[in-house]
Design a protein with these regions (language model features):
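Short, isolated positions in well-ordered beta-strands
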Residues: 263-267, 296-299
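One-carbon transfer enzymes
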Residues: 1-252, 257, 285-304
Length: 305
């Protein structure tokens, strides 16, 4: 069964490269890679055109020849000899013409941060497929893992068709992805990306065989980019939920305020949790604190203030 031509949309950093690398490992026909112009300002001329093809930096050819390409999306694409485009105006006629020249059958997206206009959505005949790290229609928005961890909700991955809304298009495939306690955020994102990649492979194979599976989303929730106040904890949470939230969002570098017995404690990091009981609201020992939760006990380090 021949592979379809794929136009890939993503970000230079993060897990976009995980998905692209997997597609290339399959031998799939990736026709090009598109990133937002705002993500690569150091590689673009001034003024920034609607779309620009990015050349590898001067030092890159030798690194690519030696098999020492950068791990990110751009390095992965250049190592594979793919054209890489930085798009500033997705609906501009010049952008549409440049991307139409790729003759893609389908577009695949992972972590792309721009809304795709209707004219571009209509370009690939098989549509746009987006990998979203939640069980849609729950947790639409730019940081779904944060909100799933904050609310102690089941985690998962969805491949859905793109439409003009925000993460609202028909679902093509979906799977739950349970995460172990204490998993750091970057590792959780990797696991979700790999689960989404497995789904995406199946959807692409089905499309190539003429099989289209899609179901509309029902009503769902949308969460915005987190603010500082969203890092606040509650002693009314289960200790496991507080621990996993802190561990999973530690790379954000934010403090975690929590009200304990009428006083605000500022936590820097989570050390552990237990299902045991504590006979008082909290116990401090130097920079360490044990906090009674509901149920369980959270063990954390206090912020130096």
């Amino acid at each position: 069964m021949p592979f379809m031509r794929i136009l890939f949309f993503g970000l230079p950093a993060g897990v976009s490269a995980v998905v692209l690398r997997g597609l290339l490992a399959d031998g799939r026909a990736v026709a090009g890679v598109v990133v937002p112009a705002a993500s690569v300002p150091h590689l673009l001329p001034d003024p920034v055109p609607p779309i620009a093809r990015l050349a590898p930096p001067a030092a890159a050819p030798l690194a690519l020849a030696l098999g020492d390409a950068p791990a990110g999306l751009l390095g992965c694409a250049w190592a594979a000899g793919l054209p890489v485009f930085a798009a500033r105006a997705l609906g501009h006629a010049g952008t549409l013409a440049a991307l139409a020249a790729a003759r893609a059958d389908v577009a695949c997206m992972a972590c792309f941060t721009r809304r795709v206009p209707p004219a571009l959505l209509a370009l690939p005949p098989r549509g746009f497929l987006n990998l979203h790290p939640s069980l849609l229609p729950a947790y639409r928005g730019p940081q779904p893992l944060f909100w799933q961890l904050r609310e102690g909700a089941p985690t998962g991955a969805t491949v859905h068709y793109l439409d003009t809304g925000l993460d609202t298009g028909d679902i093509a495939a979906q799977t739950a992805v349970p995460l172990p306690d204490g998993l750091p955020g970057p590792e959780a994102e990797q696991r979700l990306a790999l689960a989404g990649l497995a789904l995406l492979r199946g959807v692409l194979d089905d499309l190539a065989a003429g099989v289209v599976r899609r179901r509309p989303q029902g009503p769902g929730s949308y969460q915005p980019t987190p603010a500082d106040a969203d890092f606040a904890l509650s002693a009314g949470w289960p200790a496991r939920r507080a621990y996993n939230f802190m561990r999973g969002t530690a790379d954000w570098g934010k403090p975690y305020p929590i009200e304990v017995n009428g006083r605000t404690e500022w936590l820097a990091a989570a050390d552990d949790f237990t299902e045991a009981e504590l006979d008082r609201p909290s116990v401090r020992h130097g920079r360490h604190i044990a906090i009674r939760c509901s149920p369980g006990v959270l063990y954390a380090r206090l912020l130096r203030r």
